[in-house]
Amino acid sequence: MNVPRGWLAALGSVLLVSAAQLGMRWGMSRLPLPEAWAGQTPEHAALLAVALAVAAYAASLLCWLAALRHLPLGRAYSLLSASYALVYLLAASLPAFEETFTTGKTLGVGLVVLGVLTVNARRTAAAPAHHPSRKAL
């Protein structure tokens, strides 16, 4: 286990999945409903945003797999929750999304962040490099 590499991979996953969420929201809000696709020409920038968001999801998955290789599942999984806070902050801050900060949402996101910090505050004992139950083939 290489914990710094795991943290870096988890951070990459959080950033990419957050970008994917924002890109998907921006693109889909500018495209017609699926039942109207036959009669309208979709906005190319919106289609590109959705395509890039799908690619960001795929890249996020690769980062997530790397994070799972180097971090305990409980720690890694809690880090994914940081994307909720990041998406909320960016969506409410950037005018393109027309989202607003509210007391309830901010309190909820604050609790999520507090949970992530709590789970990751304690250092855990280093895991063995290999599992004793695994036998060399």
Swiss-Prot record:
A GO CC term assigned to this protein in UniProt: plasma membrane
Protein source organism: Pseudomonas paraeruginosa (strain DSM 24068 / PA7) (Pseudomonas aeruginosa (strain PA7))
Annotated keywords: Cell inner membrane, Cell membrane, Lipid A biosynthesis, Lipid biosynthesis, Lipid metabolism, Lipopolysaccharide biosynthesis, Membrane, Transmembrane, Transmembrane helix, Transport
NCBIfam families named in the record: PRK02971.1-2 (NF002816)
Entry's transmembrane regions: 6-26, 45-65, 77-97, 101-121
Purpose of the protein: Translocates 4-amino-4-deoxy-L-arabinose-phosphoundecaprenol (alpha-L-Ara4N-phosphoundecaprenol) from the cytoplasmic to the periplasmic side of the inner membrane.
GO BP term, example: lipid A biosynthetic process
Subunit architecture: Heterodimer of ArnE and ArnF.
A GO term, aspect molecular function: carbohydrate derivative transmembrane transporter activity
Pathway connected to this protein: Bacterial outer membrane biogenesis; lipopolysaccharide biosynthesis
Membrane topology: Multi-pass membrane protein
Cytoplasmic membrane side: 1-5, 66-76, 122-137
Subcellular location as annotated: Cell inner membrane
Family: Belongs to the ArnF family.
Principal location listed in the UniProt entry: membrane
Protein name: Probable 4-amino-4-deoxy-L-arabinose-phosphoundecaprenol flippase subunit ArnF
InterPro entries: Flippase_ArnF (IPR022832), Small_drug/metabolite_transptr (IPR000390)
Periplasmic side: 27-44, 98-100
